[in-house]
Amino acid sequence: MTSHALLTVEEAARRIREGRALILAGDEAALARLPAGTWIGGTTPYFMTAEGGLRSRDHVFASEVPAAAERVAIAVYAAADLPRVYAELPERGYGVLLMPLFSLAELAFAVGAPGYDGFATRPLVGWVSGTDVGDTGRRAPKVYDGRTGAALLQEAVVLQVSLPAAITAEIGIVNVFSAGGGDVLGFAEGGFSASEVLVDGRLRGLTGYLLETGLDVRRPLVGEYCGARLNVGVREVDWAAGVVHFWAPVFPGISYRHAAPVGEYVDEFLARAPAQVLAAGTEGLGFCCNCYSNYAHGELEGKRTGPFVGPVVFGEIAYQLCNETLVYLSVGGPRG
């Protein structure tokens, strides 16, 4: 039986009752019907499956914790408690963190994670839950503590997985975007929105700069954080107020460039993924998620993304909050 699958609610409930430890994604109506057990979940109706990308309110995507896991625990964190999240991960193993879009937990983690005690010393992956884009503003994103079935609006939930010494967990990011050759951009203040931008060191109004240059806001800004190339996608441009809202925060002191154009998304994903991960296939993955912006702009509905199956989400976690990336966790023996 595959460890990652799109299931009916009844199939997911059966696996929970069998005592399996699961990471679940689905519409609120589907997740609310599940029994208590060792699982965490988050809302999204979009998925990458072996048959291609799809939208479904009636199914649940399940990723099962590897059978080799020695211990699985669940913890809930309020925003003020998140600085402990790395210190409380198992010494050998990994964590999966889920939090609702625009929740207090997401805002705290997005800005504060790099300063947490033990940041990036242990593998932490996860995602930001959302809703069908047609329900934006009408339904709230949620995450679930499967021990009780409680739906959480402002907190984060973490699955803590302990592994034997012979098993390793390694985070990977597939980013189809690279920095273009345009202006170097910076921000004097950090956050999820900005009205001003530093253009090659000169302060300018951000919306005016976008109008003047005609930048395609479907492509993100690309910056380097802690040696990794990460994206900041534009969520909305409020032309009247002169403010740009982002899916992930910008940080002062980071240099950004507008992303270069991308060709066929699936081809780019597979070309940039490590060969050993592709060879290992889905069974070698302990976790995977892709960004909704990639799903929408890359027109991934009905398209297959190789071994990378999982939920389509509204922010990805690979140590810290990422955007417009595919994040995965490889679980297996030591590599030679």
Give residue ranges: language-model regions.
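Hydrophobic alpha/beta core scaffold segments
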Residues: M1-G336
